């Protein structure tokens, strides 16, 4: 939900590049939402799995589940990267027909596809943290993600133009996932459910 809010907040900056960019950005957002569905489902399943194992005192199984989820997400990420590389134009063509829009959107979709692995990692680790009862941190991390996305937009878009609209999301996914991994690694989540 926070990703959707920050994406909406960026719309004002995107609007400054004209209707082609607005349509391209919106189209890439639709495909990103489709890509996020397996990650989101994995996070939900991982949250339940984590809650059960933390409750049973089996913290080692939490790591095993997280590792398995990250590997599955990585496999899906590779699949999406290949699909975007080979069929990105056709994927975008599901939503729009204008070739100028497709060309611009393809640039954004390819940029985003480089960062999908971090998005999958972010969802998986947040799933564990939520399942372990560290939901407040996950909410705070989501707010930080929103703020970072907007900050990067205000820095990148004026400097590099339309590509900055797409890069700010990916860079934010990297930072948010690394902070979440750090939170997991320090083990504070182990004390939340007890």
Can you describe what each PLM-predicted range is?
Residues 149-157:
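Hydrophobic alpha-helical transmembrane segments in multi-pass integral membrane proteins
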Residues 1, 34-38, 114:
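Hydrophobic alpha-helical transmembrane segments of multi-pass membrane proteins
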Residues 40-43, 112-131, 137-149, 165-181:
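Short runs within selected transmembrane alpha-helices of multi-pass transporters and secretion channels
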Residues 50-115, 156-194:
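Short alpha-helical transmembrane segments in multi-pass integral membrane proteins
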Residues 1-13, 17, 86, 90, ...:
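Short helix-kink/termination motifs in transmembrane helices of multi-pass secondary transporters
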Residues 14-33, 100-106, 134, 167:
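Interfacial/gating helices of multi-pass transporter permease domains
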Residues 7, 11, 24-88, 119-141:
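Small-residue-rich hydrophobic transmembrane alpha-helices
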